[in-house]
Amino acid sequence: MLNCCHANTKLIWGPPGTGKTKTVACLLFSLLKLKTRTLTCAPTNTAILQVATRLHSLVMESLEYDTYGLGDIVLFGNGKRMKVYCYPGLGDIFLDYRVKNLMQCFSSLTRWKRTLESMSQFLQDPEKQYFSEIGLKSLEEFLNEKHSHVLSSFCTYKRISRNDDHIMTLEEYVQKLWINIADEYSDKMDNIKSFMTLEQFVKKTFCELSEKLKFLIQTLYTHLPKSFISLATMKKMFRAIELLRSIGISLGPAKFKQTLDASEKERIPSCFLPSNSEIDEFLKILSFLSSSILLPELNGRNQIEKFCLSNACLVLCTVSSSIKLYTEGMTRVKFLVIDEAAQLKECESIIPLQLPGLQHCILIGDEKQLPALVKRKIADSCGFGRSMF
């Protein structure tokens, strides 16, 4: 059928219990593997949820990397009426849930690239991040702000003593000649450090960035179509999560060493030292992910929603909800599958059947099981109760 260019309609008939819904799920699974953009409809929420549940089960059994690939499937409709969260796993393909999660990837506060950069900067120089976070100043900065005359005196001392064998450092000079200022600086720095030590900062910051990065990685490979994330990139994402877990385990109390600066009493995790191979590998992966995953510039819920609907391979909804696919700029649907088509009024069938670009339609149902219901006799006499089946 896919190779036929002419418009085509097929009927699949069968009484209850003959496997119609299972057939639909298998058909959709095959269309997914063929990357054929398909719309699947049903008259009711219950019917479309049954198809979605069967399809989700088939797809999950075939996935090699967690939920990578579910981004090619989207289910949409009224969340409260559908009660999607009563169906295990369907939340991962439900449009409202998908948009909510992707908005966090695109937002300015948790943007994907911003988080990658923050993690990279933190791993390369945690001490610098620590000093910046707590407002810790060097002795020179402290003197420049409050005791500039001491700096001037030290500069004069260095100029006079430039030929001496031993020239005191700024710390030694202040400690010897300005003991009261040295004590003032020491007390101020101790008070600042008492709020959070370097060890505490490293653990806290790594934990926060790690959780945020894991969430973003899992969100992207679950909710973005495969066309945006290649298999090679997916493997790097999985490796990144493994390294996050491994580095996190290394952050134990016995894994800390003195920093290289002998005057510094704080300690830095040994797993963060430059020689650590896991850190080197992780930094390379962060750089790779930053350049390989290019997210579109999307602002607001409506743009992300349209992006998800346009790029999905399989779209599932009720017949009446398919009106949403008439949005300007929407990618065309090639294949239409309608389950429980015998329950569908012919006039209602027109909504998905008028979609531009549609080439093939498959109707599944049993007209003797539960025909379309029309309450008004006038409407019934005019043929509104007739189904295409």
Go through the PLM ranges and name each one.
Residues 37, 42, 46-330, 373-386:
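Conserved P-loop NTPase motor core of helicases/translocases
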Residues 16, 44, 366:
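Short, conserved phosphate/pyrophosphate- and ester-handling motifs at nucleotide-, phospho-/glycolipid
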